[in-house]
């Protein structure tokens, strides 16, 4: 359902027509194309059969500024960082005017600094009225950016809770179906006799 209306999504074109876009864990970019070409590919604006690249560049630049997604539009994708490639994926979805963005394990390939930047980008997007579905098993990130959490276990719905009304312990229990010990206390290791001495 979208806005209470049942919908059928057979392919990415159906999703885009409904304003739904997905940022995959493994990016769907063409390395030898420029950033701009990757963003507009498949959604090219044409007039009398001619590509309106200047108009597309202006729209992408405006989106980039609006959401804090700075990236060199002329750089080749193969020459930019993984974090920048993710920004390109996000801009692709925004260029298509998607209102619902699905992030599939988006932090799996990012550095800690890039993760912090992504969290801020997601907050900027929601502040502008975008809806985000954030698929993750990283509880710290879920608690930092979500308003509501839905837990699935083995592909089945377990429950939905408001983030403000839960904690990592409760979410862990929902995820595995039993109480989970998040903090493990154990005695410091006691070394045994030397078995190899290298000089």
Give the ranges of each region predicted by the language model.
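Glycine-rich phosphate-binding loops of nucleotide-dependent enzymes
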Residues: 1-199
């Amino acid at each position: 359902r979208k806005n209470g209306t049942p919908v059928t999504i057979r392919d990415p074109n159906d999703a885009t027509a409904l304003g739904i876009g997905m940022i995959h864990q493994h990016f769907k970019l063409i390395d030898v194309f420029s950033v701009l070409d990757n963003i507009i590919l498949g959604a090219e604006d044409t007039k009398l059969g001619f590509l309106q690249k200047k108009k597309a560049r202006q729209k992408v630049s405006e989106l980039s500024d609006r959401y804090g997604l700075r990236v060199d539009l002329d750089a080749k994708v193969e020459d930019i960082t993984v974090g920048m490639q993710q920004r390109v994926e996000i801009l692709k979805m925004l260029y298509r005017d998607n209102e619902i963005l699905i992030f599939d394990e988006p932090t799996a390939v990012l550095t800690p600094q890039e993760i912090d930047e992504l969290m801020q980008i997601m907050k900027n997007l929601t502040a502008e009225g975008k809806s985000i579905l954030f698929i993750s098993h990283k509880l710290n990130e879920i608690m930092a950016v979500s308003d509501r959490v839905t837990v699935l276990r083995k592909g089945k719905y377990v429950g939905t809770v408001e983030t403000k009304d839960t904690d990592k312990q409760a979410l862990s229990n929902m995820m595995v179906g039993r109480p989970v010990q998040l903090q493990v206390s154990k005695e410091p290791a006691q070394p045994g006799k030397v078995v190899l001495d290298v000089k």
